[in-house]
Regions:
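Conserved N-terminal entry element of GNAT/NAT acetyltransferase domains
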Residues: 1-9, 150, 155-157
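Acetyl-CoA-dependent GNAT
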Residues: 8-12, 16-78, 89-91, 156
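Conserved catalytic-core motifs of GNAT/GCN5-like acyltransferases
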Residues: 105-108, 120-144
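Conserved acetyl-CoA-binding loop-helix of GNAT-fold acetyltransferases
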Residues: 75, 81-94, 117-121
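Conserved GNAT acetyl-CoA-binding A-motif
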Residues: 96-108
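A generic structural micro-feature
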Residues: 67, 143-146
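Short hydrophobic/aromatic beta-strand or adjacent loop that forms the aromatic wall/cage
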Residues: 41, 145-151
């Protein structure tokens, strides 16, 4: 498997796959092309035998000088549980450290139990929200009306 920095042309390969990889959920509109053009040093693609099998889109915060943010991560369903996500995250963590940052943040939907489990397994902590649902701290309407989110933070120090 090869991990490389994302290129603008990867947008045209990845976006048609996103909804399929998410079991039909409409997710592709959450990843506009600007991420592929402006965050190439902190976004990565995983390929196996020339086939795209995963990606991570992240960036360094302009507002918080010690922080970075993971915006979107996907692994081909047939390649899950092969440590592809772990390699993508580690590449991102290394890029974050090289830029003298030590805090990584990300969010997910409360319905995405796989993502919640994965992030806690990777050492992320769930940040306090404004309510608890099924034992999970939730931030109500974080991304707009009826768009609740679970917020994560990981310290790399």
């Amino acid at each position: 498997m090869e991990i490389r920095s994302v290129k603008g042309s990867d947008y045209y390969v990845i976006t048609p796959l996103i909804n399929e990889w998410w079991g039909g959920r409409n997710m592709s509109d959450k990843l506009p092309k600007l991420f592929f053009d402006h965050f190439t040093q902190t976004s990565f693609v995983a390929e196996k035998d020339g086939k795209l099998v995963g990606f991570l889109i992240g960036f360094l915060s302009q507002t918080h000088p010690n922080e970075a943010y993971i915006h979107f991560v996907g692994v081909h369903p047939e390649y899950r549980k092969h440590n592809i996500g772990k390699h993508l995250y580690n590449n991102f963590f290394n890029a974050v450290k090289q830029n003298n940052r030590s805090v990584v943040r990300c969010v997910t939907s409360p319905v995405n139990k796989v993502s919640i489990a994965y992030h806690t397994q990777m050492g992320f902590e769930i940040e306090d929200g404004d309510r608890i649902v099924d034992g999970l701290s939730i931030n109500t309407d974080y991304d707009g009306e009826d768009q609740d989110r679970v917020l994560f933070v990981k310290n790399l120090d």
